[in-house]
A protein has these predicted regions:
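Active-site-proximal helix/loop segments of hydrolytic enzymes
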Residues: 1-101
Length: 101
């Protein structure tokens, strides 16, 4: 739907470290891309998140159904910004950050 936009991070609430990972990633996405105010959401139905016994998060970086976001997602510079945000988020998670400021 064109009504939806912005990156969204999901986690399995059964693993507390997954929530921390999702929070750090979502915060970095919000700060770097400055196009969403979303917060991480619990998701107990995604198989991969349920099956893994290690911290994990699913990041949907945008909506192809949203015309403006679809253009951004096709832009190489924007793709690099998204990748950099995820990279920095993983580094922050590994260093022990909580995702809160």
């Amino acid at each position: 739907s064109p009504a939806w936009s912005g990156a969204q991070t999901f986690f399995n609430p059964a693993l507390p470290e997954s929530e921390r990972l999702a929070a750090v990633l979502q915060r970095e996405i919000r700060e770097t891309l400055a196009n969403t105010n979303r917060t991480p959401l619990k998701n107990e139905s995604v198989y991969l998140l349920k099956a893994l016994d290690m911290p994990s998060a699913l990041v949907e970086v945008g909506f192809l159904s949203h015309p403006d976001e679809s253009k951004l997602l096709a832009d190489e510079d924007y793709q690099k910004k998204v990748a950099a945000a995820l990279y920095r988020g993983i580094l922050r998670y590994a260093s022990g950050e909580t995702g809160k400021r």
